[in-house]
């Protein structure tokens, strides 16, 4: 009897996996469209399943949003690790990292993309791995001369989030994003004689702030040049 039931069980598992993936895709699009307080019934309807199916996969709204954030940070981690290993220079790795975020912007639900703040320890751990990888890329760029400005991981993450917001209807937006990226990277590689080798206390302190926080960096200090985009 167990052998006879096996094909049916495989089919049920396959259906469950398809439903879950449909829910994840629908939830991602709905959060981008309406924000994190979008109706769960709307998400279920968009996925083509009943609300009961949604609750079988995600018991609460927080579970669903937390899964979307964790999944997004894991993808960003894959991107930054690939950029770090494939980039010929620090600057090239940085370009690859942000270009990947732009290409995947409709798949990411993160705090700087309109998602809720992250609290789950396992998700924070993945986020911290991303930040450390970005720091390594920056240090590599300073060593090879392709990143000469006093950029911080916070700057890079914030700028990447700006360019990788969910798709806009303007057909020229992709080209605009890549022009802005090129301009930003050119600025990072430009030596400014006003900035000495010693980093200011304001910038050093800013490094330790959560990179997905919604707070603004402190005011510029006299003689300080920061590459933060706004």
Locations of regions flagged by a protein language model:
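Basic, helix-initiating cap at the start of DNA-binding domains
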Residues: 1-37, 41-46, 63-66
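Amphipathic alpha-helical interaction segments
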Residues: 22, 42, 92-100, 155-159, ...
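Helix-turn-helix/winged-helix DNA-binding modules
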Residues: 35-36, 56, 148
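Short linear capping/connector segments at secondary-structure termini
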Residues: 111-121, 201
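Hydrophobic alpha-helical connector segments
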Residues: 67, 74, 78-107, 118-122
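Short hydrophobic/aromatic patch on the recognition helix
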Residues: 48-58
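Phosphate/oxyanion-binding loops and surfaces in catalytic or ligand/nucleic-acid-binding neighborhoods
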Residues: 100-108, 163-166, 187-191
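C-terminal peripheral helix-coil segments that are non-catalytic and often amphipathic
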Residues: 1-7, 96, 131-132, 136-147, ...
């Amino acid at each position: 009897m167990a052998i006879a039931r096996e094909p049916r069980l495989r089919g049920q598992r396959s259906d469950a996996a398809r439903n879950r993936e449909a829910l994840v895709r629908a939830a991602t699009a709905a959060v981008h469209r309406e924000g994190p307080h979008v109706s769960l019934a709307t998400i279920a309807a968009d996925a083509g399943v009943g609300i009961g199916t949604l609750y079988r996969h995600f018991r609460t709204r927080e579970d669903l949003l937390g899964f979307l954030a964790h999944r997004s940070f894991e993808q960003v981690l894959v991107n930054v690790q690939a950029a770090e290993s494939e980039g010929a220079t620090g600057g090239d790795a940085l370009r690859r990292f942000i270009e990947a975020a732009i290409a995947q912007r409709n798949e990411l639900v993160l705090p700087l993309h309109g998602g809720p703040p992250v609290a789950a320890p396992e998700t924070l751990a993945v986020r911290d791995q991303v930040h450390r990888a970005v720091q390594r890329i920056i240090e590599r760029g300073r060593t090879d001369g392709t990143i000469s400005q006093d950029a911080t991981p916070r700057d890079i993450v914030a700028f990447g989030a700006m360019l990788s917001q969910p798709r806009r209807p303007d057909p020229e937006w992709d080209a605009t994003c890549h022009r802005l990226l090129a301009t930003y990277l050119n600025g990072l590689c430009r030596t400014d004689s006003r900035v000495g080798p010693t980093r200011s206390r304001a910038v050093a302190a800013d490094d330790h702030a959560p990179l997905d926080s919604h707070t603004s960096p402190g005011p510029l200090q006299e003689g300080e040049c920061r590459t933060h985009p706004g």
